[in-house]
Each structure stands twice: as C-alpha cells, then as structure tokens.
C-alpha cells in the first residue's frame, strides 16, 4: 500500500517531488500546503514547467482540491506549520520543502497537525541526514524529523563512498558547477548575507559557499574532516556537475577507478550512481532520476594517488526522486518496527 504523503511548499522541489511521486508507485501525495499559491495558480504552475516541460496528464480543480489524472489532492494555505491539518487529510509523512523550516524544532511543528514524520528536502543543522545508497542503514524508526541532505551531497556521497571503500580517501576538494536556483536574482539586487549571490544570475558565474562536501562526513563518518568544497553558480536552469579532486591512500590507475564505479553503478548503487562513457553535456541529464552520473571521459588522473573525478546530476529531478525513495524506505522500516 502506498505511503500517504503531504508536501509543504509548492516551489521547485515541491512540484518536482509531486511529479516523481506520480511516477514512483510507493508514494501517494494526498495534501499540499502553500500560503503563497492559490489553487488555480497551483494548477498552472504544475502543468507548465520551463525546465522539465508540460505535464503530460490532466490537471484541474474540483471541489476545492487539486486533481491530477482524476486523483484529488487536498490543498491548504497555512503559514504556520502547526496549523496544517495533515492528519485530517490522511498524510502520515510530510515533505518540508519550503527551505524555511529546516531544523528539528521548526520542522517538528508539522507533527502538531497530525503528521507522523517529517522529511526535510534540504540540509539541516541538527536533523539526522540520510543519503540513499550511502547511510540508510543508520535510520531509526524513533526519528521524527530527518533530512534528505542537499542535491550536491546526494551526488557527491555515493561517488565518494565507492572511492573510499575501494581505495581510501586521504583528503579531497570538491567544486560543484551549479545551475541557477530560486534564491538568486535575475538582475543585481540586495543580498546582505552573500553580496556575490545578489548579482544577476543570467549575467554571471558566481562563486558561492556550499556545505555539501563537509556534509559527506555526516553520512560517511570515516570521511569527516577530509572533504570540503565550494560552488560556482552558472546561468543555466537545471543540471549541475561535481568536480571532485582526491588524494588516495591506495594507488590505482584511472581504469581501475572507472571499473569499480561501473561495477557499483550496475550493482549495489544501481539507480543511484550512474556511469557513462558518452560525449555528454549538461542538458543530456535533464530529467535524470539518478543522484549522480559518473563521466568516465571527463576525469583526469595526475598520478596513481591523485585524481579528478566528474559526476553529473539533475539537481531538481534526481534529488526529488531520492526524496520519494527515502520516504518509501523509512515507511517500510517504520511498519516493520
């Protein structure tokens, strides 16, 4: 039986999580809350998407609900998470995708409305973080609020895990060349905490900070303190790429590195870590449901212990698919607890 889910925040990730949920089979979205989008506008925003294209099915309103392919979804417009009637709507698990309620204390407010568990679709300062294919075994049913980490951590961690398990990572630096996101400005505007981040997104390559590499140490404890990184925001709408430079404990040829990544992509990390030897560019990964796709032809070894590895990710679609996978996993664990 499909897990009943509510979505708080119908922005980029909220909408793409819903698209993924409709494809997933194990996830049944029964309610959406967004105080800034009325029902008619919700239909429009879900139906038309500049990046992923028009939704192929029928989207309409009926009796105050959002109806997709004949399936009714309750819609609320509460600003206070504690006031959202998740329980009444039948939502056991809530995807917190506003980007605002990212701590345990704030995300826990959803529990007051009847939700049983909250999955934050962003990194969290204090909630346990999980990355599919990396540390799901650490999940405990008593957790009420968990985080799906960031899209970049979801790309980096599976790759780092394979390399670390096979050759050992002494240390590493990561750069993510990252597509534009909703927090950026179309033209120069005020951004008091991040001056560079306030510059026009369409006109610039913008250096930015990211905690994605350090967060790998939270999901792979043996890598704690061994990785850090930065981001370049670039003028594309979606798809990003991780550039990971690592020093290895155990020497390996680039062919050996490719071999273990390919094996993992066909085995224990199938569907999460992909592998390609094609001459690909970013748009080739639009709509990719994998967390990370290793680009075998783009990497460069300097010697047998120092190597640059490249991996692509659809920072919207692939990440949203993992949100659905994480919910399906924890729901199964919760039922068997």
UniProtKB/Swiss-Prot annotation:
UniProt key word NAD: yes
Residues binding NAD(+): 12-13, 34, 79, 315
Top-level taxon: Eukaryota
Pathways per UniProt: Carbohydrate degradation; glycolysis; pyruvate from D-glyceraldehyde 3-phosphate: step 1/5
GO cellular component, one term: cytosol
Site note Activates thiol group during catalysis, residues: 178
Top-level enzyme category: oxidoreductase
Complex and partners: Homotetramer.
Official protein name in the record: Glyceraldehyde-3-phosphate dehydrogenase
Source organism (scientific name): Cutaneotrichosporon curvatum
Classification lineage: Eukaryota, Fungi, Dikarya, Basidiomycota, Agaricomycotina
């Amino acid at each position: 039986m499909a897990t009943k889910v509510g979505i708080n925040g119908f922005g980029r990730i909220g909408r793409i999580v819903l698209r993924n949920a409709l494809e997933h089979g194990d996830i049944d979205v029964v309610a959406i809350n967004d105080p800034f989008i009325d029902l008619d506008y919700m239909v429009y925003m879900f139906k038309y998407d500049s990046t992923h294209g028009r939704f192929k099915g029928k989207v309409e309103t009926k009796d105050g609900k959002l109806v997709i392919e004949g399936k009714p979804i309750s819609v609320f417009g509460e600003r206070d998470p504690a006031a959202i009637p998740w329980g009444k709507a039948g939502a056991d698990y809530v995807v917190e995708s506003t980007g605002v309620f990212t701590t345990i204390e704030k995300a826990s407010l959803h529990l007051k409305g009847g939700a049983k568990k909250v999955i934050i679709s962003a990194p969290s300062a204090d909630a346990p973080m999980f990355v599919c294919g990396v540390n799901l075994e650490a999940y405990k049913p008593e957790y009420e609020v968990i985080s799906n980490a960031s899209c970049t951590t979801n790309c980096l961690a599976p790759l780092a895990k394979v390399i670390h398990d096979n050759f050992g990572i002494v240390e590493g630096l990561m750069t993510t060349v990252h597509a534009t996101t909703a927090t950026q400005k179309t033209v120069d505007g005020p951004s008091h905490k991040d001056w560079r981040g306030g510059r026009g997104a369409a006109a610039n390559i913008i250096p930015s900070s990211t905690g994605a590499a350090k967060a790998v140490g939270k999901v792979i404890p043996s890598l704690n303190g061994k990785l850090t990184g930065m981001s370049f925001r670039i003028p594309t709408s979606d798809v990003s790429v991780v550039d990971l430079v690592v020093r290895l404990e155990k020497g390996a040829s680039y062919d050996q590195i490719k071999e273990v990544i390919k094996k993992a992509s066909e085995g224990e990390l199938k569907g999460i870590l992909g592998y390609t030897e094609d001459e690909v560019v970013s748009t080739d990964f639009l709509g990719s449901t994998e967390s990370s796709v290793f680009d075998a032809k783009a990497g460069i070894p300097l010697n047998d212990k120092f190597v640059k590895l490249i991996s692509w990710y659809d920072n919207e679609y692939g990440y949203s698919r993992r949100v659905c996978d994480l919910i399906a996993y924890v729901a199964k664990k919760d039922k068997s607890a």
